[in-house]
C-alpha cells in the first residue's frame, strides 16, 4: 500500500502534462538570456537584449573605487553582492555539472559570459584583503521610485564589510562564487582562473578570521541563518577547486554546524553544502557521512509520500515553501534533487530510505522534473512562469526596465515619480524580458499577472540561476 501511495502521489504531479513536449533547450537559452537584461555597467557590443543600455557608470566613484558592472538583482536598480554571489555560484555549478548538456544546445559560451559578468564585479568589490563592498545603491530611495536603470538618479550609496565591521555570510558566499567559477575557467583561461581562486582563498580567510554576522550591518538581504553555512559552503567549493586537505579538514572539523533543513536559498546554504560533500563521501571521504545523512533528510522533507515530508505541494503539484517569491525555493530544491540523484547513480546506489518509505533515484528525478515542467507550463493554468516561453506567460513582471519604454524608444528622462504612470497601467510591459522567471503562483495555483503584486510577479537572478542547472539536467533525456 505504501508503494502504491507513493506512485499515486507522484503521478499527481504529472497530471497536468501537456500534449506537446517541452523544449528544455529553448528554456535554457532563455534562462541565460535573462541575465543580459539584468546587466549594469557598460554593455558589450554583442549585447542581445536591445531594450537595455549603459547604466551605473559612476558606481563606486564616491569612494574612488570602480564598482561598475554586475547585476541588478531583481526588478529594482540596486546591486546586492551577497545574492549576486549566490547567483554566480549556482551558475558555475550548472556549468560544471551539466557542461555536456549545455554544450549540446550551444549555450556554454553564453553561460560562461554570464558567469564572468558576475565574477568581474565580485573581483572589483573585493578591493583589499579584508574589505568587500556588499551593496551599491540606496534600497529605500530606489524602491520608492520607478525608473529605468539608464535614468536612475537615486543615491548610489555604498555599503561594505571589513575586519572591524564583518559580514562572514557575504564574504563566504563571494569566496564560494569565485572558487566555483575558477573551475569553470580552469581549462579555457588559466590566468583568470588563478585570479579567481586567489581571491576566493583571501575572501574565505577574511570571512573565517573575522567572524561576524552580516545581520549586524546590512540594510537589505539580511542574514537569518547565520554564517556557518556560508563558511562550510566556501570551504567545500575551495576543496573542489584545489583538492587541498586543509579545506576538507575544515568541513570535517565543523561538520556539527550542518543541520537538517528543508530549504536552500540565498540565505541558507546548508543543503548545497550537504549535496556537495555527500558526493565526496561517495568518493571515499568517510568522515563526511553526516552530510550524506543531512542531504537525504532534505530530500525526504520534499518528496511526496515521504513519512518525513515537511513541504507540502499546492493542489497543482508545485512545492510551496513561502508565498513570497516561492519559485526561488522550488528551483533551488530541484537543483539539489537533480544533483543528488546523479550522485547516487554514479555511486551505484539505487534508492534512499525516508522513514518507512523508500524512494528510487528515478522517483527523485521524476519529481524534480515535475517541478521544472510545472514552471514551464504543465500546471492548472497552462501557463509558463518564464517570460517568453510558450504561448502563455507573465506579461506584467514587476521589473522597472521591462515595464518602462526603452531609452531607445523614449530618450527623454522618466523621473522617479514619472515612472509610476507606467507602473499603474494594467497593460503588458513594453519590453519582453525574455527568460525572466517570476515569483510564481500562490498556494492555490493562481497567478494574477499584475506588476503591482511584487511577491508573485518579480523575477530575481537567483531564481533563474538555480533553474539553469535543473533544466540542463533534463536536456539529455528530452
UniProtKB/Swiss-Prot annotation:
Decide whether keyword Signal is in the record: yes
Q: Which GO terms describe its biological process?
A: cell wall organization; cellulose catabolic process
Q: Which residues bear sugar attachments?
A: 29, 442
What is the catalytic activity of this protein?
Endohydrolysis of (1->4)-beta-D-glucosidic linkages in cellulose, lichenin and cereal beta-D-glucans
Q: Where in the cell is it found?
A: Secreted
Q: EC annotation?
A: 3.2.1.4
Q: What is its main location?
A: secreted
Enzyme class at the top of the EC tree: hydrolase
Q: Where is the active site?
A: 76, 398, 449, 458
GO CC terms: extracellular region
Q: Which domain of life does this protein belong to?
A: Eukaryota
**UniProt xrefs under Pfam families:** Glyco_hydro_9
Its signal peptide is 1-21
**PANTHER family in the cross-refs:** ENDO-1,4-BETA-GLUCANASE
Similarity section: Belongs to the glycosyl hydrolase 9 (cellulase E) family.
Protein name in the entry: Endoglucanase 18
What organism does this protein naturally occur in?
Arabidopsis thaliana (Mouse-ear cress)
Amino acid at each position: 500500500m505504501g508503494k502504491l501511495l507513493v506512485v499515486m502521489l507522484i503521478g499527481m504531479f504529472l497530471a497536468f502534462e501537456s500534449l506537446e513536449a517541452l523544449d528544455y533547450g529553448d528554456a535554457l537559452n532563455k534562462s541565460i538570456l535573462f541575465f543580459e537584461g539584468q546587466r549594469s555597467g557598460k554593455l558589450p557590443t554583442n549585447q542581445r537584449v536591445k531594450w537595455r543600455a549603459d547604466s551605473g557608470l559612476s558606481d563606486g566613484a564616491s569612494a574612488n573605487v570602480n564598482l561598475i558592472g554586475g547585476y541588478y538583482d531583481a526588478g529594482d536598480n540596486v546591486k546586492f553582492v551577497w545574492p549576486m554571489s549566490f547567483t554566480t555560484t549556482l551558475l558555475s555549478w550548472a556549468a560544471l555539472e551539466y557542461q555536456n548538456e549545455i554544450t549540446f544546445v550551444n549555450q556554454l559560451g553564453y553561460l560562461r559570459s554570464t558567469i564572468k559578468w558576475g565574477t568581474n564585479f565580485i573581483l572589483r568589490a573585493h578591493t583589499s584583503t579584508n574589505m568587500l563592498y556588499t551593496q551599491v545603491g540606496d534600497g529605500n530611495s530606489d524602491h520608492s521610485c520607478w525608473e529605468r536603470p539608464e535614468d536612475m538618479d537615486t543615491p548610489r550609496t555604498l555599503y561594505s564589510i571589513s575586519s572591524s565591521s564583518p559580514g562572514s555570510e557575504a564574504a563566504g558566499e563571494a569566496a564560494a562564487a569565485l572558487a566555483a567559477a575558477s573551475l569553470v575557467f580552469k581549462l579555457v583561461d588559466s590566468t583568470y582562473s588563478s585570479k579567481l581562486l586567489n581571491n576566493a582563498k583571501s575572501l574565505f580567510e577574511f570571512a573565517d578570521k573575522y567572524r561576524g554576522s552580516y545581520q549586524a550591518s546590512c540594510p537589505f538581504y539580511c542574514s537569518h541563518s547565520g554564517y556557518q553555512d556560508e563558511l562550510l559552503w566556501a570551504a567545500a567549493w575551495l576543496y573542489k577547486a584545489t583538492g587541498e586537505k586543509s579545506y576538507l579538514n575544515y568541513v570535517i572539523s565543523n561538520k556539527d554546524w550542518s543541520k537538517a533543513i528543508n530549504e536552500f536559498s540565498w540565505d541558507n546554504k546548508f543543503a548545497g553544502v550537504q549535496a556537495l560533500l555527500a558526493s565526496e563521501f561517495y568518493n571515499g571521504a568517510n568522515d563526511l557521512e553526516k552530510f550524506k545523512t543531512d542531504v537525504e533528510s532534505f530530500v525526504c522533507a520534499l518528496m511526496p509520500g515521504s513519512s518525513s515530508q515537511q513541504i507540502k505541494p499546492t493542489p497543482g503539484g508545485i512545492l510551496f515553501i513561502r508565498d513570497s517569491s516561492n519559485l526561488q525555493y522550488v528551483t533551488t530544491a530541484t537543483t539539489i534533487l537533480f544533483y543528488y540523484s546523479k550522485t547516487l547513480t554514479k555511486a551505484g546506489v539505487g534508492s534512499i530510505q525516508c522513514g518507512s518509505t523508500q524512494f528510487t533515484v528515478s522517483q527523485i528525478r521524476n519529481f524534480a522534473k515535475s517541478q521544472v515542467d510545472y514552471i514551464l507550463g504543465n500546471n492548472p493554468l497552462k501557463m509558463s512562469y518564464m517570460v517568453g516561453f510558450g504561448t502563455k506567460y507573465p506579461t506584467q513582471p514587476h521589473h522597472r526596465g521591462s515595464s518602462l519604454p526603452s531609452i531607445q524608444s523614449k530618450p527623454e528622462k522618466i523621473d522617479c515619480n514619472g515612472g509610476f504612470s507606467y507602473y499603474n497601467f494594467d497593460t503588458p510591459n513594453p519590453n519582453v524580458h525574455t527568460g525572466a522567471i517570476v515569483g510564481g503562483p500562490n498556494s492555490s495555483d493562481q497567478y494574477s499577472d499584475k506588476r503591482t503584486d511584487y511577491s508573485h510577479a518579480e523575477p530575481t537572478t537567483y531564481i533563474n540561476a538555480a533553474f539553469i542547472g535543473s533544466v540542463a539536467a533534463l536536456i539529455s533525456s528530452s
